[in-house]
């Protein structure tokens, strides 16, 4: 009598949007929230609310292709009852209370190239990190697929490398309660 093959758990379903135009802020929001909640139109509406009387909106690209700033990300999260907390790079990453954090959004320098030619320009790129079923993932919209970072040590290693390169900013996506209690920070 043969035994049935051992059932293997299926890999977790990880939501991951790929890069389109300069919409990395929209992709980072949706990736960190693990569903499509925001669109370019929704981000543009937030821009209009942030600068209602501005002819040239300072929160997005002049070309209308995205390139949203941190104010748009923070307002989008606030609209969902969430908060973005700036991580102070001077703090040791061991003080980051990851179980209290829904996800992370990083703002990284991104090289500009024209084919094989690298241009001496610096752009910024928004990247989401999120835990799904106990595994942290790099959900960079420029990646073909989510990149598993592993457990808390893996995400701390990734963050340390990103911060060591300089010009990296880290936002912690947390609930309002976690923000108000300050329990995203482990000081013990």
UniProtKB/Swiss-Prot annotation:
Keywords: Cytoplasm, Hydrolase, Protease, Ubl conjugation pathway. GO terms for molecular function: cysteine-type deubiquitinase activity; deubiquitinase activity. SMART domains: Josephin. Disulfide bonds: none annotated. Its main location: cytoplasm. Coiled coil: none annotated. Signal peptide: none annotated. Its EC number is 3.4.19.12. It is an enzyme of class 3 (hydrolase). It is found in: Cytoplasm, Cytosol. Gene3D superfamilies: 3.90.70.40. The active site is at residues 24, 125. It comes from the Eukaryota. Residues 11-188 form the Josephin domain. It catalyses: Thiol-dependent hydrolysis of ester, thioester, amide, peptide and isopeptide bonds formed by the C-terminal Gly of ubiquitin (a 76-residue protein attached to proteins as an intracellular targeting signal). GO terms for biological process: protein deubiquitination; proteolysis. InterPro entries: JOSD1/2 (IPR040053), Josephin (IPR006155). Cleaves 'Lys-63'-linked poly-ubiquitin chains, and with lesser efficiency 'Lys-48'-linked poly-ubiquitin chains (in vitro). May act as a deubiquitinating enzyme. This is Josephin-2.
């Amino acid at each position: 009598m043969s035994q049935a093959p051992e059932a293997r758990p299926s890999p977790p379903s990880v939501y991951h949007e790929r890069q389109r135009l300069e919409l990395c802020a929209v992709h980072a929001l949706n990736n960190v929230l693990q569903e499509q909640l925001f669109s370019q139109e929704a981000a543009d509406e937030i821009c209009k609310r942030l600068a209602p009387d501005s002819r040239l909106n300072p929160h997005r690209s002049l070309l209308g292709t995205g390139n949203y700033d941190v104010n748009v990300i923070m307002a989008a999260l606030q609209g969902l009852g969430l908060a973005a907390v700036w991580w102070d790079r001077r703090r040791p990453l061991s003080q980051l209370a990851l179980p209290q954090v829904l996800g992370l959004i990083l703002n990284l320098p991104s090289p500009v190239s024209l084919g094989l030619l690298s241009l001496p320009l610096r752009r910024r790129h928004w990247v989401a990190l999120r835990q799904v079923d106990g595994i942290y993932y790099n959900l960079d919209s420029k990646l073909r697929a989510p990149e598993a970072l592993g457990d808390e040590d893996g995400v701390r290693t990734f963050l340390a490398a990103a911060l060591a390169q300089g010009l990296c900013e880290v936002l912690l996506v947390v609930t309002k309660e976690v923000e108000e209690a300050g329990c995203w920070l482990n000081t013990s």
